[in-house]
Design a protein with these regions (language model features):
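A short SAM/SAH-binding and catalytic strip from SAM-dependent methyltransferases
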Residues: 125-137
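Substrate-binding/catalytic lobe of Class I Rossmann-like enzymes that use SAM or dcSAM, i.e.
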Residues: 176-266
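Class I SAM-dependent methyltransferase SAM/SAH-binding core
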Residues: 48-115
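N-terminal, positively charged/glycine-rich alpha-helical extensions of SAM-dependent methyltransferases
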Residues: 1-18
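A short glycine-rich, Lys/Arg-flanked "PGG" loop and its adjoining helix->strand segment in the class I
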Residues: 139-154
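Short, glycine-/aromatic-enriched active-site segment of Class I SAM-dependent methyltransferases
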Residues: 160-182
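Conserved alpha-helix/loop element of class I SAM-dependent methyltransferases that forms part
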Residues: 13, 28-45
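A short acidic, Gly/Pro-enriched loop at the edge of an enzyme's catalytic core
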Residues: 114-126
């Protein structure tokens, strides 16, 4: 759903966003989640940060604008996204992002999350902002994170989760959302077990689903016609409009289901901090 709404907002940020009473739109919510994760990760005391599954590196750009001394390395297996991110950071033609005065301290590596190309104990933070659910496999990423983190380093994971042992069966009965949740569906208990088995100690878990699922669903439901107008603007051919209506109806039903499963306590969204 976030890439879909992102097309309407023009955002390069690939996360659900953190919504409050003051939040006006998805872009503001997405930036707020980046800010929240930066604070949760104690980036103010870090020097070298690995952003794994970095997307278009919008979180890295956001963090660098706040924590100017950070050296951020963006890891992404998607080469096309990395090339786009490079343009965004360097402000080459085709990018509308302002050049960062210290952009040279944001770098890019095309690699898998499960084989991180770094020596042992070399980084202060490993951050996976809404990306770890896509890693194959999650435990290998966690073990690699343990290997490259310094002794006082932190692993930070922001991730949507299944909340109870029975939830997976309940989730599979909820129809279309099972199809549009395009990632692994991890139970929180399993994630905690993997983190501990890799030698980490969990310091803190924040449950922020109340600021994620319902407000995002409500925004989409309330603004679906506006979003349609923006996406189809300049190209509203009959065939494209019909195709859009089919796809949009799927996302609309998914938004309703996402709100429903959160209200039933089947899913949540957590921030995990471990060392």
């Amino acid at each position: 759903m976030t890439p879909y709404i992102g097309r309407a907002t023009g955002s390069n940020i690939l996360n659900f966003g953190y919504w409050s009473e003051k939040t006006k739109d998805p872009l503001q919510a997405q930036n707020e989640l980046c800010r929240l994760v930066g604070e949760f990760a104690n980036l103010n005391s870090a020097k070298k940060v690995i952003d794994v599954g970095s997307g278009f590196s919008a979180p890295a750009i956001h963090w660098k604008s706040i924590y100017s001394l950070l050296n951020i390395i963006c890891i992404n297996i998607n080469l096309l996204q990395l090339k786009t991110a490079t343009k965004l950071v360097s402000n080459t033609p085709g990018s509308d992002t302002k050049t960062l005065s210290n952009a040279k301290e944001i770098s890019f590596v095309n690699a898998a999350a499960t084989i991180l190309p770094f020596v042992d104990q070399c980084v202060d933070r490993v951050v996976a902002l809404e990306s770890a659910q896509h890693f194959k496999s999650l435990i290998r990423f966690i073990r690699e994170s343990k290997r490259i983190l310094k002794r006082d380093g932190l692993l930070i994971i922001a991730i949507p989760v299944i909340t109870t042992a029975k939830s997976l069966q309940q989730f599979m009965k909820l129809g279309i959302l099972s199809l549009t949740w395009a990632s692994e569906r991890y139970k929180l208990t399993n994630i905690k077990s993997m983190i501990k088995s890799a030698g980490f100690k969990i310091i803190e878990i924040q449950y922020i689903g109340s600021h994620i699922y319902e407000p995002l669903s409500d925004y989409y439901i309330q603004n679906r016609n506006i979003i349609k107008h923006i996406i189809l603007k300049g190209d509203s051919s009959y065939f494209r409009t019909i195709l859009y209506d089919i796809i949009e109806n799927i996302f609309y039903k998914s938004a309703l289901k996402m709100k429903e499963v959160y209200q039933k306590g089947i899913i949540d969204y957590v921030l995990i901090k471990a060392h």
